[in-house]
C-alpha cells in the first residue's frame, strides 16, 4: 500500500504470472493480464476461484503478435529445452489460450484464432511436447471451427489446427494409458490418477474434434480408438489382461 500511495499510479506495479496465489496479497481482483505479468490497476475485474480474470485484450494482443521475442523456442533445428524452459513454455501456452478465449467469448473469434495460430507456430511440439495444458486450446479451436460468423478459410484453419494438436496429444496420452494398463497390479494402482486424467483428456479431445469435424476419417478413427481404450481400461480394472487388445497405431498420429 505504501508503494501505491507513493507512486500515485504513475509507475506500474506488476506481478509475474508464475507466482502463486499466496503472493497476490489479496489484490487479485485488481489484476489485469498484459502478457506474462499481471498489472495492478485501480479497476475491479474480480476473480474466479482465487485466480485473476482481468485481461487487457488489445494490449496483450499487440504484445503477443508484435513485441514478444520467443528466445529460440520456435527454432527449426534441434535445441535443448531444460525443465525450467519447458515450464515457461507451458505458461506461455496457458496465457495465450486465455487471451484467445477472451477474444472468442467477446465475439472476436477471428482474433482468437490468430492468437492460437501464433501459439502453435511459436511453441512447436518438436521442441516442447504437448501436454494436457493444450486441451483448452484444442477445444477452443474446435469451437471456432464451427463459428458461422467466420469465413470458410478461417473455419478450415481452426479445424486443421485443432486436429493437428489434438491428434498429437491424443496419441501421446493414449499410448500412456496402454502402457499403464499393461503393468502389474501394484504399478497399475500407483498410476491410477494419471490414468484417470489421461482418459478424461483423450475423451474430451475426441469429443471436441468429432463435433467440429464429424466427417473427417482421422477423427473417426480417433473415436474408434477411444472406444477401444475405454474397453481396455474397463477390462483392466477387473484384473490383469492376459490378451491385451490390438490398437490401431495410426489413430491419433
Feature annotation, model-predicted:
Residues 1-253:
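ER/secretory pathway lumenal C-terminal domains and tails of membrane proteins involved
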